[in-house]
């Protein structure tokens, strides 16, 4: 039987892609290992809940990976139904409940795989709310469980340190002055850098993250999608902290390569634009805006007078939350598409982000600060404007702006709304100012460092090799 590593990704698209790319990376450098990826699959007639999590949209991606990388095996596992009394939760938190209720199904799948292969390790996405002991207790041999942290070392430091600061957050939660929080290896942060769901330390989300931190501390190791050159202080703090028992394996940047997706004419349009002249605006698979915010973005782009390629989700979010898809003409200011057709391109719903960022014409990126997107921009040397929307993205913004210094931050009001003037000013500053040039030079150096980390003898390659050696010896 072949030595097998089982990867168990979260339902979210960004988490799935990152885990699949980790599997590809392992196979590239350690082909003697076999990779099986567990995929939670909704019932034949999916509920609105599971549809919200875009399980169906992942099917096309999985089919593409199966066709292009047949050495990766996908093992489908039934997704458990949620109890009727489950509270309303945003998608990234809802996925926690779905995985938690699917623990028994995952355990059965692992028992099935163990009969046909030699399981050497199980790698679980940190956002899968499963107790590793419950998953592995019925396996004949002691299979080590590792956690894959799909974001960076800085947010991992916050997560693992959160149980330490949580009592203070509760004690100070009603004070008017913002609490200054010092996490080892990071700049000083405040509660404003936390995910929106964690502003109240007594919230459901905070209780979940406390449990996740506790669970991760019991793993055999934590695999992190980062590299030393961009988060040196955070990595050092985690590695040297005696209170963080699991060894750290920084194997990044683990990013997706363009794999022949339909480009909707984006690349042909970019071919006609001058070098480093276009700003890409793309906000991830869950990045939806209200009608008012979309119009404000459009006005801001006109004010910036820059070339742009804007990916617009036609399902509204925010105050206008709706699954109904509207036309671009219904969503954008009257005449906007006609007025900007010489300088801009607007694409509905989706575009091949990795391929676009790698194009010579792209010189800036307005991003939601999802970590996969940040790493893709770093690997292509594209400077950023940071506009976080959900999950850990506000913390990522702090890292991008203060620690890495590869982005400008947009300032939103207390409701999260960004004005056209603010967006237009930040885009123009990125593309035309001396500060923008400094950021461009800095991120180009990080691009070189990313390549070095992944090359033979690099820090990330060394971490991967060390990890694979442990697996083979287990």
From Swiss-Prot:
<feature type="binding site">
    <location>
        <position position="372"/>
    </location>
    <ligand>
        <name>UDP-alpha-D-glucose</name>
    </ligand>
</feature>
<feature type="binding site">
    <location>
        <position position="393"/>
    </location>
    <ligand>
        <name>UDP-alpha-D-glucose</name>
    </ligand>
</feature>
<feature type="binding site">
    <location>
        <position position="391"/>
    </location>
    <ligand>
        <name>an anthocyanidin</name>
    </ligand>
</feature>
<feature type="binding site">
    <location>
        <position position="371"/>
    </location>
    <ligand>
        <name>UDP-alpha-D-glucose</name>
    </ligand>
</feature>
<feature type="binding site">
    <location>
        <position position="373"/>
    </location>
    <ligand>
        <name>UDP-alpha-D-glucose</name>
    </ligand>
</feature>
<feature type="propeptide" description="Removed in mature form">
    <location>
        <begin position="1"/>
        <end position="49"/>
    </location>
</feature>
<feature type="active site" description="Proton acceptor">
    <location>
        <position position="15"/>
    </location>
</feature>
<keyword id="KW-0808">Transferase</keyword>
<dbReference type="InterPro" id="IPR035595">
    <property type="entry name" value="UDP_glycos_trans_CS"/>
</dbReference>
<dbReference type="InterPro" id="IPR002213">
    <property type="entry name" value="UDP_glucos_trans"/>
</dbReference>
<feature type="binding site">
    <location>
        <position position="15"/>
    </location>
    <ligand>
        <name>an anthocyanidin</name>
    </ligand>
</feature>
<keyword id="KW-0328">Glycosyltransferase</keyword>
<dbReference type="Pfam" id="PF00201">
    <property type="entry name" value="UDPGT"/>
</dbReference>
<feature type="binding site">
    <location>
        <position position="353"/>
    </location>
    <ligand>
        <name>UDP-alpha-D-glucose</name>
    </ligand>
</feature>
<dbReference type="InterPro" id="IPR050481">
    <property type="entry name" value="UDP-glycosyltransf_plant"/>
</dbReference>
<dbReference type="GO" id="GO:0050004">
    <property type="term" value="F:isoflavone 7-O-glucosyltransferase activity"/>
</dbReference>
<comment type="function">
    <text>Involved in the biosynthesis of isoflavonoids. Specific for UDP-glucose. Can use genistein &gt; daidzein &gt; formononetin &gt; quercetin &gt; kaempferol &gt; 4,2',4',6'-tetrahydroxychalcone &gt; apigenin &gt; aureusidin &gt; esculetin &gt; naringenin as substrates, but not cyanidin, trans-p-coumaric acid, caffeic acid, benzoic acid, m- and p-hydroxybenzoic acids, salicylic acid, salicyl alcohol, and hydroquinone.</text>
</comment>
<feature type="binding site">
    <location>
        <position position="150"/>
    </location>
    <ligand>
        <name>UDP-alpha-D-glucose</name>
    </ligand>
</feature>
<comment type="subunit">
    <text>Monomer.</text>
</comment>
<comment type="similarity">
    <text>Belongs to the UDP-glycosyltransferase family.</text>
</comment>
<feature type="binding site">
    <location>
        <position position="376"/>
    </location>
    <ligand>
        <name>UDP-alpha-D-glucose</name>
    </ligand>
</feature>
<dbReference type="GO" id="GO:0016757">
    <property type="term" value="F:glycosyltransferase activity"/>
</dbReference>
<feature type="binding site">
    <location>
        <position position="351"/>
    </location>
    <ligand>
        <name>UDP-alpha-D-glucose</name>
    </ligand>
</feature>
<protein>
    <recommendedName>
        <fullName>Isoflavone 7-O-glucosyltransferase 1</fullName>
        <ecNumber>2.4.1.170</ecNumber>
    </recommendedName>
</protein>
<feature type="binding site">
    <location>
        <position position="368"/>
    </location>
    <ligand>
        <name>UDP-alpha-D-glucose</name>
    </ligand>
</feature>
<feature type="active site" description="Charge relay">
    <location>
        <position position="125"/>
    </location>
</feature>
<feature type="binding site">
    <location>
        <position position="392"/>
    </location>
    <ligand>
        <name>UDP-alpha-D-glucose</name>
    </ligand>
</feature>
